[in-house]
Amino acid sequence: SRSLPSSPVDVASSLARLGAGLSKQAATVPGLAREIYKVSQKAKKDENYVSIFQAPDTVLNQTVTGSRRFAAQSYSLSRLKVIAKAFGCTVNTVVLSMCGHALREYMISQNALPDEPLIAMVPMSLRQDDSAGGNQIGMILANLGTHICDPANRLRVVHDSVQEAKERFSQMSPEEILNFTALTMAPTGLNLLTGLAPKWRAFNVVISNVPGPKE
């Protein structure tokens, strides 16, 4: 267990760190309020814009059980790069769009495709080339375009969604990003555990390109 400060100097130092931390967190409130307002307003004007708690109800979002299934699929990276270059996006965005297509086809096969697009929670590195310290990760919400039949149009919607999330985070401090993520994701986590607020769904699936263990 963590030991308590043993001297007045240690106590003063701990209180100073606590005060600095609280001040830094409090300073994020205006920025968070501004971003939440912007998100809510833009969502009213753009049907493809990803707002908070707009993920639709799907057959995927049920009580978690012990049943598990693993499937793997390989694709040529060179082909993905050609597509990414043609559409002016990243390979990761192409993969997100492919996942959107796969989910759309699966939902259609189950007669369960919602009218609204599925939303993915995507871990994203926020590190700058000159930044110090450990990992800096943010969680963005991406529109997977599952309501769109045309693959090219779907890719454009996914790309726009990812870019908007990146631009939003680029204008925020690390503390604001952390608190914004917590504010938008925490209610969803609570709902997953309790099922008390089924409408508080920020995302339907998690899609990540974080490498797994090499062995």
Predicted features along the sequence, with ranges:
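Soluble acyl-CoA-dependent acyltransferase catalytic core bearing the H(X)4D motif
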Residues: S1-E215
